């Protein structure tokens, strides 16, 4: 028998050396050598060959050059040569030319706010000398000869030597990153780096149309970029990007000078709906400085997503001018980003103008004509229950029995062209912005390839996939829409069977699954007027009240509405980030997510949606929270019957005028014209709502179901699908089909 105490003692002895913590002296802080500091800084400023070209070209522009030539070898690693015809560099300035923080652009920090030049830090040339071999040849106006000098680690390797030169400056950067082995190994794709240099100079050429640019590979005769001085910016775009781009551009201008301090001018060119490209090209200059702005790019892409066909991307050139004190240019080592005062307002105004311009120009489109050879289509299926099967060549095709013959095809249903004949409403709804109306005509997109990183969302998606019913999935993928049987059920055909399908249940499940799969990747529907949460929630509470005449409950309803409003305000950041449900600081709802790109939910159900978020979501547990919010969104976006009764059949009585005079007249005459006794405005709204719902069910819901829906096993038994007929049984009764 083993003694427990001795065993415990032995274990403690074995573990004690591992748990002993040896005191350690804190490391000594040392001052880095200046050469180390300079090399680290050089790696930040000159990140790849295109960074060096950008700095050198900007220096040439600061020198009032009218012609700039760039020669590149091995993507810029072997050689970068930039020549210009600017004012040159004085002989007495050459000794300190490549020292850090030496510049002719400013003398004190306050000069940053009135700076008109590209460079200002005095770091670019210095950084190049720490990671490459730099040679400068220059001559100023009036000099008899020029000077050439080489630099290394910020200092001259020798005194300037007299040489023959043409007006301006030529800077050669050789063996870039020769002393940074890791950086050099990551830049072995010379074609990629040269492409970035060509793209940079192309962008520069269309903005600085008063300067001639050229770029070619070392030893090449033909230049890959060659622009000439042109009075028209559109001509510059045509010469650089080609006629196919220039002919599809529209001019756009925006300006603002309000009392709040948002002052700017923007002019540029944007592509129309006939332009087709696979990548967005945004050429953005702010105060004549080439920069990037991801927020502006994203805002423009959202507008174009509603108008461009397929996955096409736009071409956009914009030049924005602001007061120099409104721009902070000193926020990035390579100066590719700037910070703007009132940036969000500026982006919103530009986005609105682009949207208006596109909407006004979207009346006509150009399509390529192509001859179509009509061939006989055959239906093939590998399923055992399919009435038609594919036979090897050379064998006689077996005749399909008449009682199993299917004349429909789910991939080419009858009436598919109706999707392009959606009637436009006479007036836009007040609750949804015009952008969402434009977006409603967009064809179905695929879900984002990136999935959410959160394990809770991945578990929810995995749960949806694991509960999928294979038989129901096959039915959903290959069914054909027949028509609406009533307000809730649609008739669908699958092979030789006819089913009733509950469109409310199907759409609710589809929207729930889409919310999970598009988690944190939503586009947004902008409401034209922000809606106060408290009023909407209070309205939902009153609609649920079974005793509306009881005023004693009003205080309780108001308190519940206030509590839910505060709760949603508290969760606003999470709702915005993950679900694109935007609630501002004043507790107003201003944006909703796009679950299906062709579909806008019934805005009359917003109060019910907000109340559901407040009452039915378990906010404390992450997985339960995301599931509850997704379920609430799924129920809100589900294709419920409109609140107005269906005017077909008995529902028409709801729209009768209830005026006393008309009722008396009806009683007296007995045969008054029914049309004269109807509220035509209300009837028209109802007819439009029901027609829009049926169109959405046929052309949005069912195509999206075939792409995205994973029907759960519960749908096989809860009445979502009900089999009503089959060709085999009908043939037994009628002996014909």
Curated annotation (Swiss-Prot):
GO terms for molecular function: ATP binding; ATP hydrolysis activity; ATP-dependent DNA damage sensor activity; mismatched DNA binding. One of its GO terms (biological process) is mismatch repair. Disruption phenotype: Reduced fertility and mitotic defects: 72 per cent reduction in homologous somatic recombination. Coiled coil: none annotated. InterPro entries: DNA_mismatch_repair_CS, DNA_mismatch_S5_2-like, HATPase_C_sf, Mlh1_C, MutL/Mlh/PMS, MutL/Mlh/Pms-like, Ribosomal_Su5_D2-typ_SF, Ribsml_uS5_D2-typ_fold_subgr. The keyword DNA damage applies. Keywords: DNA damage, DNA repair, Nucleus. It is found in: Nucleus. Residues 1-21, 378-416 are annotated as: Disordered. It comes from the Eukaryota. Signal peptide: none annotated. Its main location: nucleus. Ubiquitous. One of its GO terms (cellular component) is mismatch repair complex. The keyword Protein transport does not apply. CDD domains: HATPase_MutL-MLH-PMS-like (cd16926), MutL_Trans_MLH1 (cd03483). Residues 378-400 have a biased composition (Polar residues). Gene3D superfamilies: 3.30.230.10, Histidine kinase-like ATPase, C-terminal domain (3.30.565.10). Heterodimer of MLH1 and PMS1, called MutLalpha, which is the major MMR MutL activity correcting base-base mismatches as well as IDLs. The heterodimer binds double strand DNA independently of a mismatch with positive cooperativity and has more than one DNA binding site. Heterodimer of MLH1 and MLH3, called MutLbeta, which is involved in correction of a specific subset of IDLs when associated with MutSbeta. Belongs to the DNA mismatch repair MutL/HexB family. Involved in DNA mismatch repair (MMR), correcting insertion-deletion loops (IDLs) resulting from DNA replication, DNA damage or from recombination events between non-identical sequences during meiosis. Component of the MutLbeta heterodimer, which probably forms a ternary complex with the MutSbeta heterodimer that initially recognizes the DNA mismatches. This complex is thought to be responsible for directing the downstream MMR events, including strand discrimination, excision, and resynthesis. This is DNA mismatch repair protein MLH1. It comes from Arabidopsis thaliana.
């Amino acid at each position: 028998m083993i003694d427990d105490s001795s065993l415990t003692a032995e274990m403690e002895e074995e573990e004690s050396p591992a748990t002993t913590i040896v005191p350690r002296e804190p490391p000594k802080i040392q001052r880095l050598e200046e050469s180390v500091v300079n090399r680290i800084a050089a790696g930040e400023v000159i990140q790849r060959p295109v960074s060096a070209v950008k700095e050198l070209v900007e220096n040439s522009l600061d020198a009032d050059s009218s012609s700039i030539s760039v020669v590149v070898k091995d993507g810029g690693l072997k050689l970068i040569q930039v020549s210009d015809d600017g004012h040159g560099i004085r002989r007495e300035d050459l000794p300190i030319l490549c020292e850090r923080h030496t510049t002719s652009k400013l003398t004190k920090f306050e000069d940053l706010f009135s700076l008109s030049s590209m460079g200002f830090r005095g770091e670019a040339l210095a950084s190049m000398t720490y990671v490459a071999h730099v040679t400068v040849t220059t001559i100023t106006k009036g000099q008899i000869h020029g000077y050439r000098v080489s630099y290394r680690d910020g200092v001259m390797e020798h005194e300037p030597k007299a040489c023959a030169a043409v007006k301006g400056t030529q800077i050669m950067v050789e063996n870039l990153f020769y002393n940074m082995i890791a950086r050099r190994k990551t830049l072995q794709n010379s074609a990629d780096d040269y492409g970035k240099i060509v793209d940079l100079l192309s962008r520069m050429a269309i903005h600085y149309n008063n300067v001639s640019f050229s770029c070619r590979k070392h030893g090449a005769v033909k230049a890959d970029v060659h622009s000439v001085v042109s009075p028209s910016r559109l001509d510059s775009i045509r010469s650089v990007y080609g006629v196919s781009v220039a002919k599809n551009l529209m001019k756009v201008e925006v300006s603002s000078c309000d009392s709040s301090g948002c002052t700017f001018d923007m002019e540029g060119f944007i592509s129309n709906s006939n332009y087709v490209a696979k990548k967005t090209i945004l050429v953005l200059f702010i105060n004549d400085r080439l920069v990037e702005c991801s927020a502006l790019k994203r805002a423009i892409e959202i507008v174009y997503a509603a108008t461009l066909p397929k996955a096409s991307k736009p071409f956009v050139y914009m030049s924005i001018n602001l007061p120099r004190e409104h721009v902070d240019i000193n926020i990035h080592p390579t100066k590719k980003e700037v910070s703007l005062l009132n940036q969000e307002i500026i982006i919103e105004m530009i986005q609105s103008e682009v949207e208006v311009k596109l909407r006004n120009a979207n009346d006509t489109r150009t399509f390529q004509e192509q001859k179509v050879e009509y061939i006989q289509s055959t239906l093939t299926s590998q399923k055992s229950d399919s009435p038609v099967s594919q036979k090897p060549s050379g064998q006689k095709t077996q005749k399909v029995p008449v009682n199993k013959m299917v004349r429909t095809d789910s991939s080419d249903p009858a009436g598919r062209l109706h999707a392009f004949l959606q009637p436009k409403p006479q007036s836009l709804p007040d609750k949804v912005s015009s952008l969402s109306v434009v977006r409603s005509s967009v064809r179905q997109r695929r879900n984002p390839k990136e999935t959410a990183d959160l394990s809770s969302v991945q578990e929810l998606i995995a749960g949806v996939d694991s509960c999928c019913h294979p038989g129901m999935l096959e039915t959903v993928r290959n069914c054909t829409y027949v028509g609406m049987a009533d307000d809730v059920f649609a008739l669908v055909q699958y092979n030789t069977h006819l089913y009733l399908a509950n469109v409310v249940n199907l759409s609710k499940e589809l929207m729930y699954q889409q919310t999970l799969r598009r988690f944190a990747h939503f586009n947004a529907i902008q409401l034209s007027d922000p809606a106060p949460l408290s009023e909407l929630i209070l309205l939902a509470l009153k609609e649920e009240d079974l005793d509306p005449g009881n005023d004693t409950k009003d205080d309780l309803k108001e308190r519940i509405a206030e509590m839910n409003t505060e709760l949603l305000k508290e969760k606003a950041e999470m709702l915005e980030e993950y679900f694109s449900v935007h609630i501002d600081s004043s507790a107003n709802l201003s944006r909703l997510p796009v679950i299906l790109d062709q579909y806008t939910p019934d805005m009359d159900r917003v109060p019910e949606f907000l109340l559901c978020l407040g009452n039915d979501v378990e906010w404390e547990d992450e997985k339960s929270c995301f599931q509850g919010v997704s379920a609430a969104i799924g129920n809100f976006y589900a294709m419920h019957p409109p609140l107005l009764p269906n005017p077909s059949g008995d529902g028409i009585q709801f729209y009768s005028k209830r005026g006393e005079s008309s009722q008396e007249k009806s009683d007296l005459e007995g045969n008054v014209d029914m049309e004269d006794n109807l509220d035509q405005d209300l009837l028209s709204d109802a007819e439009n709502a029901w027609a829009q719902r049926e169109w959405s069910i046929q052309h949005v819901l069912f195509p999206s179901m075939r792409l995205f829906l994973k029907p759960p096993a519960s749908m096989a038994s809860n009445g979502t699908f009900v089999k009503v007929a089959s060709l085999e049984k009908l043939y037994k009764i009628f002996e014909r089909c």
